Structure formats: C-alpha cells, structure tokens
A protein has these predicted regions:
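A short, Lys/Arg-rich alpha-helix, primarily the initiator
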Residues: 1-23, 72
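Helix-turn-helix DNA-binding elements, focusing on the entry/boundary residues of the two helices
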Residues: 16, 27, 42, 57-60
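DNA major-groove recognition helix of helix-turn-helix/homeodomain DNA-binding modules
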Residues: 52, 56-73
C-alpha cells in the first residue's frame, strides 16, 4: 500500500494575506501579533501569502487565533473567512 501525497490547501495563501490586510498589519507587525518572533521572520510572511512556503502547524494555529477562526477555516478550501476579521466567535 503506497503513501498518497498530501494535498496542499489551494486557498491558504490568499486567506493568510486576507487576515493580515483585514487587520491592517505589516509583515513585521504580523510576526509580532502572532507571537512568533522566534519561529519566523517577516520575509516568511510574504512566502506564506504567495504560496511559496507553508507555515508550520503552530504558526497556522496562531493565525487562526489572531483572526478568531478555527484552523479548519484556514486549511479547508471549501470554507471562507468571515466577512469581518477578527471574527466575533470561534467555531468549535
């Protein structure tokens, strides 16, 4: 039995960019708001937003918390971000 390649979320990059722009943050401010200064540098935010690189699970979790959405919203291509960010209530 072979291992199937993992499917990459197609809309993740656009969602991460949408979160940052909706919150009015620069890439540097995004890193600080995520509390991820020891994990990522501002240039990586650009790579996440263009799809050149995927963030780690912990960074995805922090993006979800920043936007007040569940991680599923970020990685499931069938789910859209709320019209207003940060969202009022988290999905559980």
């Amino acid at each position: 039995m072979g291992v199937r390649p993992r499917q990459r979320p197609q809309r993740l990059a656009e969602k991460l960019l949408a979160i940052r722009t909706a919150l009015g943050l620069s890439q540097t401010q995004t890193v600080k708001s995520l509390g991820a200064e020891e994990m990522i540098v501002p240039g990586q935010v650009s790579e996440f937003e263009t799809g050149k690189r995927e963030p780690s699970l912990i960074v995805l979790l922090r993006y979800a918390r920043l936007a007040n959405v569940c991680v599923d919203t970020l990685i499931d291509d069938d789910l859209d971000l709320p019209a207003k960010l940060p969202a009022r209530a988290k999905h559980r």
